[in-house]
Amino acid sequence: MGAESLVAGLAIIGIVIVVSALLSGLVDRSGLPQVAVFIFIGAALGPAGFGVFDMTLTSPVLRVVATLSLTMVLFTDAVTLNIKEVRRRAGLAFRMLGPGTILCAALTALVAWWLLGIPPALAAILGAALASTDPVLLRGLLRRRDISLVTRQALQLESGLNDVVLLPIVVVAIFLSGQHELPSASFPKIGFGLFILGPGAGIAIGLMAVAALDLIRKRIGVRRDYESLYSLGVALSAYAAAEAVHGSGFLSAFAAGITIAALDVELCDCFIEYGGVTAEMLLLFTFVIFGSSLIWTGFYGLDTRTVIFAAFAILIRVPVYLISMIGSDVDKHGRLLIAWFGPSGLSSLLLILLPVFAGVPGSDQLFRICALIVLISVVVHGSTPMLFARLLGQHEPEAPPKPEAPNEPRPLPVLELVQPTGTQSITLEELDQLQKSGEQVILLDVRTERSRDTSDSQAEGSIRMPPENVVMQARELALPKEAWLIAYCA
């Protein structure tokens, strides 16, 4: 049985990687919700399909995968934040988190208590979980270039910061739901572990990690792709360190990510380039696990009150965020998009699993309600990028190709002039040789916005090309296909 479980696990991991790679282009162009694809893959592999595996709330594997996923979600949220942008947009961040996230959570909890008769502590957990926005669903919308910069920044700030606001609510409510078993002296200890030990351990691990990496960089050097794996190791180490001292491992992972984001821009960019893909694979793998059977429990015992509550939980965001955006510099269309697009997804499911793992009575009901709302949100919010693309005319006509100049004899073959040091790099001496030989050479500044914040200097004659949607940008810039395109990112 152990061997069969291992084979099934490896098969699922392989399917996630292969399918996500094959569908990446289709998802980007069509706006198709990637999450929905993996939920249905899970359904096909689950008991209703091929019966490869059946996951329940008591499965030990679920706890391991959920813990890893929530750790990666919080760390990724933190490490991808642009700290300078957060400071610059502090007022906007407050609007998104204060009147926005917290008020949505409070109103949802109130209606859950009033309409569904859920105890106050459990209602608070449900409200907080449903107020969390899903990073995977949100990523597809943030990649669109026809959304204004301030709108993207607002959604990024909310996605990066709202989980760290909601997680303490969930943790405190879990303890309150079982407070009859806890002495009053336990609450200061719980608060100390949650708000001091957890973040403190994360900051300490982050500081040591950045210092060690900086030392090794200067003396030996570190490969860029391995720096992303290094950051993943930091996330897991921060979680373990906090749990070892009875702190919150999840808040520790977030604190470690914030520390890295504040101190080491290059490591953050490495994580976005390489580690971010690894983390996303884990999150998609988690969707497959939920899709096997767990998420479909949302239809069990469905009644009119639950349907009304689900509609309220999804729609309450619209008036709350429209009001919170009054007086901001976000335009009307941006406000409507922000107010509408608050998808519930993996983050909501992971937060709602915390009381399940803690053995809180009635938490299985919370999971079923949350699963139903996540399914609705995947359909409703997941189709938003696709509808948005159609409304704004995503498929812009391609610029006609420039007439090619007649071939002219070149003084020397390029291969005789340049012996590349690698398939992805070129030295300054080789660049100089190319330019002197008469070759058409175009320098591309492909630094991320975060990297440019440290220095706005740009190589003379280079063209700015952010590292997103590069094919579309190349067409817009009419870059000649026969030219040498040399990109630099530092």
Where are these regions (language model features)?
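Transmembrane helical cores of multi-pass secondary ion antiporters/exchangers
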Residues: 1-400
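Alpha-helix initiation/capping motif
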Residues: 46, 223, 295, 407, ...
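Short glycine-centered, acidic/aromatic-flanked micro-motifs in structured strand/loop junctions
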Residues: 128, 489-490
